[in-house]
Amino acid sequence: MEENYLRSIDDPKGIIECYETYGAVGITGVLSVQECMETVEEVKEIIKQLGASEQFNIYDPNTFDNWPDMNKHMNKPGVIGTLPIITKILNRNRFHPNVKKAYSLIYGLPEDQLLAQFDRIGWMRPVLDKDGNKFPQYATPLKEPGKHLDVNPSYYFDESKADEVYSWLNKLTFDSLRHLISENNASNVKFGRHCIGVLNLLDNKYENGGFRFTPGGHKITPSWYIRNQKRLDYGSANGNYFFDEKDEEFLHSSRIPCPAGTLIIFDAALPHGTLPNQTSDIRMVQFLRYMPKKLYIEKTLSRRKKLILDYCNKNGIKLDFI
């Protein structure tokens, strides 16, 4: 039977085994269909607040001109905004019992030792309308091998830089929401496992595009880094890396097509990317991850918590479970 990398939220053993074997797992049943639909409606409202008119329809590329500032508020791959997007519904998903359960399982840590992180949403646009007319301007760009790491290899794989990364994290002042994005990619193997996640809000078929990865690649990247260390020694503690044609061992790719409500969690050392959409359907996701609380000292945790609570209180968003 062909591996599909999907495991139920009620299969903890299967979740852990899949993650450890392949570096990624699609955990099904994390959100209900109703919760997904509520989130899709929330995304529609967010887009409206960013300037889309009543004539705009997220499913119909013929209407996309009714969001004049689209290219200002989202990038080519479909990520909306440059700051974390914080709303009641998105927070419900961030702190959902099944989300906390999933991350607790994979990290091997109690839920109260993990911190929910605040990120953005993704709306990957269709390249066809329902009549088959083409809209290539909305295609997700792809340059093979089309994979990257959401960490800087130099700072992540080199254990001698662990103290530098720890210091960098704890120097974050959290006087801006931007720091909630800055913290995302800062880690080091010495800290233990580092996980990243994508919550799928709609059914995602292979041809719809989406998450792809090199199965088991997280086991190869440490030795790849050692061989390529000299050319990789640059950048900042929270950087990233885009693979190129020299990185032949990561050319092979697999996808994880999945039903709505599936949370794909993958390892920071796993080469991954996005396969472009080829259809008239959309893909919609919430970027959703957790990190170990131990990476921050108490003063940093207090600054971070204050920033989040102040923002939520100012915007009338109830948040009593941080």
Tell where the protein language model's regions lie, with residue ranges.
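Catalytic palm active-site di-aspartate
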Residues: G23-A24, G261
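Residues immediately flanking
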Residues: L109, L149, L201, D267-A268
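Catalytic core of non-heme Fe(II) oxygenases with the double-stranded beta-helix
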Residues: D131-E248, S253, I297-L301
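Short, solvent-exposed loop/turn segments at secondary-structure junctions
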Residues: G23, L31-Q34, G122-W123, L128, ...
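Residues that flank catalytic or metal-binding motifs in active/ligand-binding sites
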Residues: I86, Q117-D119, K143, R193, ...
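Non-heme Fe(II)-dependent double-stranded beta-helix
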Residues: M1-T21, T28-N170
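Non-heme Fe(II)/2-oxoglutarate
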Residues: Y5, S53-F56, G210-F213, H218-E245, ...
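A structural signal for short, well-ordered beta-strand segments
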Residues: I121, G197-L199, Q286-Y290
